[in-house]
């Protein structure tokens, strides 16, 4: 048998910690081992894209572009790879062609060599702009075909999609098995067909989850696959990829030997084991719920997100119901593969169906957009009843979705204004307006607002930072400590024009073990209302879920409603950002808005009062 070295892409810096550690590894934790990783001889290092962009801005207070530059500066021999969601880029909706082109250009300039591009629906129209931009930048366009199991996803379907992508100029193909559903013998059939029909390298990306992936890799290797994805052992298994060390060992002495240095791999693993222990992060394990992926087909990473979402809603005990609801919703909307952003869209709809007790009563904007065709063509037929219920008489579009995107990069450049110091800042804002604006405000305030000695915490707004600075950080810290140690629930500090309120967080409401009423599992927050609201019989609109309250769809535009406005029943009042999606909240009565009871950008609890409306 002719020797054929198998290439290995290491996912440690991107998908591995996204899958197991909620994408919380910091750039500083990667730095000490980058040169060691560079010397291994990997086919590529996947280090950017996916959820890492959002997580840097939202949770780590880091600039994702700076992370890429830092990695590039320390990795000189190994190609750097990113995951790009086609027309979604690294976000959760479609962006205009000019934004896609500029994003690809800047990613290439900052260090990306290989762009793995996929579309959640395998709609090849959503590859076109990114593919052309990658080619123009002189970089490698790897087209990924998303694998799933459904009545409409056949072997011929995958070959047809792959053929269109090769015609588009793909330099290589990847089969993306995000849910670990690809069985060893089906992989053999699929890879054999791909190698027979297309003269481009084939890569296979599998998650471990239920444990099939190592066997699937071996059968795929025998069938001719060229490259596989793995992760260092502290970040392998469970929702992540198989361990690099295990796969390398399995191939030693075979015609497929990867020729990677095991001792160097173990040194890398020892370092990341230290990072894991310091971060308090878990190893990848396979639970019964994960093993049941072969039944419910919900990817492990999606299960982790669902668990997090339900904890936020104080309804973790409802997970089994949500897992039962997901396949039902998926079938109703045409069997989309459960990969970002469709995993969030379908999963969130299932959560809302279960927690509200009324199926399709609350529908996020993203689900509405999907049903309109704004993400692309559904793989299978969509339930006409669902379309009518959500869209009414509106018909789904038939053109390429990006052709209807109105916002341009220049529009966002004007919105963000002087907060943006470079095109990268404008792109971050275009993808995540609220999150990026908050980040840019924190980092462009200047050292005079650096009230905690290094950097203000991410949860402080610019106004709060200024107020704390004027009041004195040490005094604020002392007051916080005093409130925490006392029976006080709230203390107000006033000095001159500065007023700071320190308030204890209420304990989480208890959740009954038996599940209780479907619509009231999470205890509602019944905050005291003002006398004007109580005495005038105003209708109170409350938060139907835990989330972040926004009065407008973008920081630069007017609120949906203001005090004194007349609203109709069903009219949008605000947006609640929950479970990574934007959910429009409509008024359930017609009347006049008398009070807005929550601050813009504030975290709100289930049942918290948001608006007081005088019924018409």
Q: Residue locations for each model-derived region?
A:
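N-terminal small/glycine-rich loop or linker at the start of catalytic domains
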Residues: 1-23, 75-92, 135-149, 192-199, ...
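Active-site beta-loop-alpha junctions enriched in small/polar residues
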Residues: 11-14, 18, 50-52, 83-89, ...
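Catalytic domains of carbohydrate-active enzymes, especially glycoside hydrolases
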Residues: 29-51, 106-114, 168
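Terminal or standalone catalytic/regulatory effector modules within metabolic enzymes
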Residues: 36-56, 287-290, 297, 301-475
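Active-site beta->alpha loop and helix N-cap motifs at the rims of alpha/beta catalytic domains
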Residues: 49-161, 173, 183
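Catalytic alpha/beta core domains of metabolic enzymes, predominantly
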Residues: 178-360
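Acidic, compositionally biased tether/linker regions
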Residues: 445-542
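Structured functional modules or segments
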Residues: 518-616
